[in-house]
Each structure stands twice: as C-alpha cells, then as structure tokens.
Amino acid sequence: MHCALYDAGRCRSCQWIEQPPDTQLAAKMTDLRTLLAALPVGEWGAPVSGPELAFRNKAKMVVSGSVEKPLLGMLHRDGTPVDLTECPLYPASFYAVFAALKPFIARAGLTPYNVARKRGELKYLLLTQSTLDGGLMLRFVLRSKEKLEQLRAALPGLLAELPQLKVVTANIQPVHMAIMEGDEEIWLTQQQALAESFNGVPLWIRPQSFFQTNPTVASALYATARDWVRALPVNHMWDLFCGVGGFGLHCATPEMTLTGIEIAPEAIASARASAQALGLRNVHFQALDSTDFATGQQAVPDLVLVNPPRRGIGKALCEYLSHMAPRYIVYSSCNAQTMAKDIGEWPGYRIARVQLFDMFPHTAHYEVLTLLVRE
C-alpha cells in the first residue's frame, strides 16, 4: 500500500506498510504459533484478511492548529501536529466530511485545544460510518460546555451540507490528559444510535460503546464464532465482555438461553435493541462487570464466550472458569500473548480450533479466535 504520509515521514502508525500483505500475514501466523507452541492445537484455520486500504469505519482525530485553520489528525510526542485527513485507511466518504468540518469549526468558533497552554475547547473529532447505509456518527469532544450553544446554533448548516450525518453528540472531557472521551454525552440530534448489520444481524453503534473498526474482518469473525458454536450441543451460553452483543447475537438461536454481560450501559442498550429486533426471547443482557457476574453464579452454562480487552480476562475470572468448568470456552482476543497466558491457566482444557483474523493490516496486531473443549 502506498501512503504519502508515511513516505514523507509524517506518520509511522502503519509500521509494516512496506511489507507485502502476504508477508505480514505470515509473520502474524508465526507469532501466534510461537505463543501457542506449548499448547497442542487440534486444528489451525486458514487466516482471514480483508482490504489493505479504506477498511476503517472510524476516525479518531486530534484537533489542533487554530480556529481559522484547524488540523485534524494526531500530535507527535514533541507536540508537533500532523493532519491525517488523507490517510488511505479511511473510506473515500470520509474525505468530504473532513473537508466540511474544517470551515465548520471556524464558523462555530470551536477553538482547538492547545495541550501546552491548556487552553481551547475542541479536543477530538470522532467519526464512525455504518456499512449498512453509509450513515455517520460524529462526536465533538469538548473541554467544557462553554461553546455548546455555539455548536448547536451552527449545526443545522452542517447537517444540511452532510445529510449522511445521522447521529451527532458533544462529549465533555474536562481533564488535561490524553483521554479520548469523558463520561458526559450530550445528543445534538434526535437519532441516538447508528444502525449497522453484519451477516443479517442488526447491530447498533452508540457513542460510548466499543465497536470493531474493520467491518469486513469483524463480520467474518462473528460468522466463524457462529458456525463453531452452532455445531456444538449448546443450550445455554454466556457472552462475557459482550460489547454491543455481536458474538452472542450471531451465536444465539430461538431455543438457546444467552446471557450477555458488559460493563458499559450504552453497549448493553444497543445489544438489547438488537435482540428485540431479532425476536430472541431467551436473551438477557446486563450492564455488569463480567468477573463480578461470573463469580457470583452457581449454574454452569454449556459454553462461555469471552472477548476481553488487551489485558486479558484476569486472574480471578481465569480461576473461576477453571473451577466452574463449562464444557466449552470460546476466546476471542486482540492480544494473543495475554490469551495464551490465560489459556495456560486451564489445564483441564484442550484447544480444538484456532483461527487468526487480520483486523489491523500494516501493524503487528491481529485478532484470534480459539475454541477450547473440556477434557
């Protein structure tokens, strides 16, 4: 993939960009096999990859520069701003949005936040696109509510210029730290969630809920989990760290009992809406800590699916799952190193299947799906 930003030395986020896609994929497979070398694997699935450019459905842009000439992109460690509006990882539809946002920032008087001076209002722009209909969600991350009414007043013009904008919010992040968002979300449009669909499963993207950034590969990941689970005798499953319910909703059947647990209330609201749209009556989503939920249960499900953050599922949940001993565990991970460590804590299980999903081209990162069966 060619990238003018990389060639000019302005961005090094895609550290593997000079390697051909096949070479990147082979290196990731080697890394995964090395991490699981001490754990016998029954079946290695063929790695899954997607487009090498224009695959991201989300842009997280630091806003810098001046109110008259804002820059949207990132800051180097020395504070030097870099405009990333022409990043080839974004879909072509984003370019028109970025072009419209720069003069809008000036019209609305949203002074970019200056980290060194601790002054200004607009910290980030967070843009997400649905592959279902091209609809967009735009979040303005502000230091305070000082410019909120100016933003409201100017917004109708932006919505008229960009009719694909379906959800717009202001997020208040008052802390002088590199934190992407604060706790308070203020909706500026009537619509509060972006409609999405993978493999015929309706999903909803809300402002403060995690959603995969590579829709093509994420769709394949969910479909694979569905195929694995539905081939097993599963009547009751848990989906821990469930997010908006992508895994559980793909796996669930009308007869199956599914319990989905996620700490973020916004994500649970999305999951419940999807379950209702699918007509699933034996599905229960709750906004709880996954470890606290699991360790407080007595009944043992047939299968537990976990999709934890990069740090893994943690010692307490590892020990509890080992003690509880469900017949099957499906582990989806964006950090194979912590996954391998967690699986090493389950001596009573064997790895039946493993498959790599190249969710993050041009980097060393990848997603991996593993099926474990109790011995």
UniProtKB/Swiss-Prot annotation:
Gene Ontology process terms (BP): rRNA base methylation
Residues involved in [4Fe-4S] cluster binding: C3, C11, C14, C87
PROSITE patterns: SAM_MT_RNA_M5U, TRMA_1, TRMA_2
PANTHER family xrefs: RNA M5U METHYLTRANSFERASE, TRNA (URACIL(54)-C(5))-METHYLTRANSFERASE
Binding positions (S-adenosyl-L-methionine): Q212, F241, E262, N307
Pfam families: tRNA_U5-meth_tr
E.C. number: 2.1.1.189
Sorted UniProt keywords: 4Fe-4S, Iron, Iron-sulfur, Metal-binding, Methyltransferase, rRNA processing, S-adenosyl-L-methionine, Transferase
Described purpose of this protein according to its UniProt entry: Catalyzes the formation of 5-methyl-uridine at position 747 (m5U747) in 23S rRNA.
Name of this chain's protein: 23S rRNA (uracil(747)-C(5))-methyltransferase RlmC
Top EC category: transferase
Enzymatic reactions: uridine(747) in 23S rRNA + S-adenosyl-L-methionine = 5-methyluridine(747) in 23S rRNA + S-adenosyl-L-homocysteine + H(+)
Active site, per annotation: C334 (nucleophile)
An example molecular function term from Gene Ontology annotations: 4 iron, 4 sulfur cluster binding
Keyword Repressor part of the UniProt annotation: no
NCBIfam families: meth_trns_rumB
Alphabetical list of Gene3D superfamilies matching this protein: 2.40.50.1070, Vaccinia Virus protein VP39 (3.40.50.150)
UniProt similarity note: Belongs to the class I-like SAM-binding methyltransferase superfamily. RNA M5U methyltransferase family. RlmC subfamily.
